[in-house]
Amino acid sequence: MSSRITKQRLEDLLDRINQATGHKLEAWTQDETGRNRANVGTYVLDWAYGGVRLSQLTNEGGGERDITGRGTKRETYYRMHAFLDGLDAGQRGE
């Protein structure tokens, strides 16, 4: 029997990915003028159309690039684990 993949489990895995890549855990930061700015490079979860995907912020306005395709929570969980495994292998020089 497999365990339930929850939003919290995806968010925990997202934090691990951001930590492994040296990016901030928060997607947005308020600057000195009070405007919200995206933390460029930070990985985020994009929820829409009943699914979720892993994306990365590409500019201060909140533009994103897709890292994975949109899928169910379980599909995205497995894709995020594969992504993290690839990061770990690259850092080990494999």
Please report, for each region that a protein language model flagged, where it lies by residue.
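Negatively charged, low-complexity tracts enriched in Asp/Glu with abundant Ser/Thr
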Residues: 1-41, 58-78, 82, 90-94
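Short aromatic-glycine-(Arg/Gly/Cys) micro-motifs in beta-strand/loop hairpins
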Residues: 45-63
